[in-house]
Every structure is written in C-alpha cells, then in structure tokens.
A protein has these predicted regions:
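ATP-dependent carboxylate/acyl-activation modules
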Residues: 1-224
Length: 224
C-alpha cells in the first residue's frame, strides 16, 4: 500500500514526526450556564480544534486561541480572586476549566508533584504547562528583550499575553517583532520529517529559522 502523501513510501514505513498536534474540545457551557460542567464518559463537547507546532507548549497555546472563547490564553480571570485553598480544591474537580486551574496552581507556587497527586495528570504534561508559567515569570522579571521575545514566541505566546507580563503595550510588542525581524515560518506536515518529498503538502506556522514553503508556480492558491 503506497503512502498517499509521499507517493514513495509504503504503509509499513515507520512515521517520523517532527511536529506536535493538540486536539482541544469546544464546550458549550457559556450558552448553557446551568448545565453540569463535570467531564466524564458522557459526550458533552460540541466541537474541537486541532493545532500544530514544533513544541507541545506552542500547540497548546495555539489551540486555546483557535477556540475563540474566553481570553484565548491559559488564564481565567475569575480564578484571580480565589485563595490558595480554593485552587487546591478546584484541582480535584474534573470539569472544562481544569487545565486553567492547573496553570493557576503553578502560578501560585503549588509544586507539579502535588498537582500530579491531586489530579493524576501525568507529570510530563504538568511540566510542559510549567514551562509556559516560567516564561510568564521571566517576562515579568526581565521585561521584553530580543532573547525573551524569541523565547516567548517559540512557545507561541500571543502578543497580548507578552504585553501583559512585560508590562508594555501590544503595539510595543509588534514594534519589537518588526525590529528583530521576528515572524513565523511555515513547516510542512508529512510523515517522514521532510526525508522524502510530499506530494500533498500542507503547512503550519511556527517560529524557527527555516521556511519550508516552496513556490508552487504562478497559479498557486492558498487555502486557510
């Protein structure tokens, strides 16, 4: 069986993946405010988004923006006023806000091991979210520099979040990106890490040092 993407490899060819995919459910609870928000075996999501990036942190933050709900970032404003005790209690609840509670717990200094004990979420994922929180703290401490901007964009932190933590305006962040010529590149989605040519390529944006998009001719069409 020939791989329909590369046209050169077979179905028995072991895939080599150089990107991460995050699928995130879309919950309808903002419309059904009285509905039970607990998550279990019953289907409650009304849709989902899928995001691709070179890092898990970046794919997660992309997915949150794609939901077009709330703040579009790993933060819930209503958690700001909760006490540390309340945050620990909320961690034990399995609902649509659990990921945001987890991030808030890390902001408050609760150790990943304690979060793992309460939630049973694998430490691998908790550490990845902790990387995002560490970037927030770095921006708060160091402000916006070429180095911190590149590090923040490497994990797909959006401009409004960077502006908030660096305590500057969104326009300043945009000017910094232009000053340092920092813009997203486009990588090809295939199953062979670009080892073979892909005959049905599609792309995702990421902040790296190499663009894999090739001119397709005068009559090329871009589909978003």
């Amino acid at each position: 069986i020939t791989n329909s993407i590369t046209k050169r490899t077979k179905a028995c060819f072991e895939p080599s993946i150089d990107y991460i995919v995050v699928k995130f459910p879309r919950w309808p609870f903002e419309k059904f405010t009285l509905a039970d928000r607990s998550i279990g075996t019953q289907m409650k999501a009304t849709g989902e988004v899928m995001a691709l990036d070179r890092t898990l942190e970046g794919a997660l933050l992309k997915a949150l923006r794609s939901l077009e709900a709330g703040e579009g970032y790993l933060h819930l404003k209503k958690l700001d006023g909760q006490s540390l005790y309340d945050i620990r209690c909320l961690l034990s609840r399995i609902d649509n806000e659990r990921l945001f509670v987890l991030a808030e717990a890390l902001r408050r200094g609760i150790e990943p091991e304690e979060i793992n004990r309460i939630t049973k979420i694998d430490l691998f994922f908790i550490y990845k979210i902790q990387n995002i929180i560490r970037m927030e703290r770095r921006l708060l401490k160091e402000g916006l520099t070429e180095e911190t901007l590149k590090a923040a964009k490497r994990i797909q932190m959006p401009d409004p979040a960077i502006a908030h933590f660096a305590e500057i305006s969104i326009k300043d962040v945009e000017n910094f990106r232009k000053k340092f010529n920092l813009h997203p590149d486009y990588k090809m989605v295939d199953t062979c890490a670009a080892e073979f040519e892909s005959y049905t390529p599609y792309y995702y944006s990421t902040y790296s040092s190499e663009d894999e998009v090739k001119p397709q001719g005068e009559n090329a069409v871009i589909v978003f």
